[in-house]
UniProtKB/Swiss-Prot annotation:
Family affiliation: Belongs to the cytochrome b family.
InterPro entries registered for this protein in UniProt: Cyt_b/b6_N, Cytb/b6-like_sf, Di-haem_cyt_TM
TM ranges: 1-7, 31-52, 67-79
GO CC terms: mitochondrial inner membrane
Topological type in the membrane: Multi-pass membrane protein
Keywords annotated in UniProt: Electron transport, Heme, Iron, Membrane, Metal-binding, Mitochondrion, Mitochondrion inner membrane, Respiratory chain, Transmembrane, Transmembrane helix, Transport, Ubiquinone
Cofactor binding summary note: Binds 2 heme b groups non-covalently.
GO biological process, one term: mitochondrial electron transport, ubiquinol to cytochrome c
Protein name per Swiss-Prot or TrEMBL: Cytochrome b
Length: 79
């Protein structure tokens, strides 16, 4: 969905809302693509948080190097 949305992306901040409105109104199934993208991203981060919770449960934070790499990856995902 990100590739389909990127085709209609506008980097100008004054046209950002117009870009979203164009995608939803003028692109065939644009509203569906936008909703799938938003819900898919939310599900992705829920899975990430569950994975972190599993690490807490099994004590993976005791392995400092692995845990620090995981923290760096999480921060990279959020950036």
């Amino acid at each position: 969905t990100a590739l389909l949305l990127a085709m209609h992306y506008t980097a100008d901040t004054s046209l950002a809302f117009t870009s979203v409105a164009h995608t939803c109104r003028n692109v065939q199934f644009g509203w569906l693509i936008r909703n799938l993208h938003a819900n898919g991203a939310s599900m992705f981060f829920i899975c990430i948080y569950l994975h972190i919770g599993r690490g807490f449960y099994y004590g993976s934070y005791l392995n400092k190097e692995t845990w620090n790499i995981g923290v760096i990856l999480l921060l990279t995902l959020m950036a």
